[in-house]
UniProtKB/Swiss-Prot annotation:
Gene encoding the protein: hba
Entry-annotated residues carrying N-acetylserine: 1
UniProt-recorded name of the protein: Hemoglobin subunit alpha
Function: Involved in oxygen transport from gills to the various peripheral tissues.
This protein's record includes keyword Heme: yes
Domain (Globin) ranges: 1-142
Organism of this sequence: Trematomus bernacchii (Emerald rockcod)
GO MF: haptoglobin binding; heme binding; iron ion binding; organic acid binding; oxygen binding; oxygen carrier activity; peroxidase activity
């Protein structure tokens, strides 16, 4: 679970990178569909599933909006993300393993876009936070 130190590190990092959330989301989602092409199946209803396409950009923005929500609900991710968990479990039917895949892509993008801010301490705290988000999103699958 997240310590107070982890929570503070995530909040501090988000305060520096949050204004770039749309770009992070686009790059992370674009990276995911290239590196893990099987994830494209969730977006087969889109006319264009290429990196940086309008649909990828829009969904990347939506994903990072969810991350911003999670930062604001960091003290109780399970309750704070319940609605998103229900949506992903019952409506979208996303395999929860994909949350971990996207988390990895988000970490890679943040590390390349913000090398100074992405210290080893920030890395471990953000990784733990994103793992907590994935766990909270998977809650309704049980």
């Amino acid at each position: 679970s997240l310590s107070d130190k982890d929570k503070a590190a995530v909040r501090a990092l988000w305060s520096k990178i949050g204004k770039s959330a749309d770009a992070i989301g686009n790059d992370a989602l674009s990276r995911m569909i290239v590196v893990y092409p099987q994830t494209k199946t969730y977006f087969s209803h889109w006319p264009d599933v290429t990196p940086g396409s309008p649909h990828i950009k829009a969904h990347g923005k939506k994903v990072m909006g969810g991350i911003a929500l999670a930062v604001s609900k960091i003290d109780d991710l399970k309750t704070g993300l319940m609605e998103l968990s229900e949506q992903h479990a019952y409506k979208l039917r996303v395999d929860p393993a994909n949350f971990k895949i996207l988390n990895h892509c988000i970490l890679v993008v943040i590390s390349t876009m913000f090398p100074k801010e992405f210290t080893p301490e920030a890395h471990v705290s953000l990784d733990k936070f994103l793992s907590g988000v994935a766990l909270a999103l998977a809650e309704r699958y049980r």
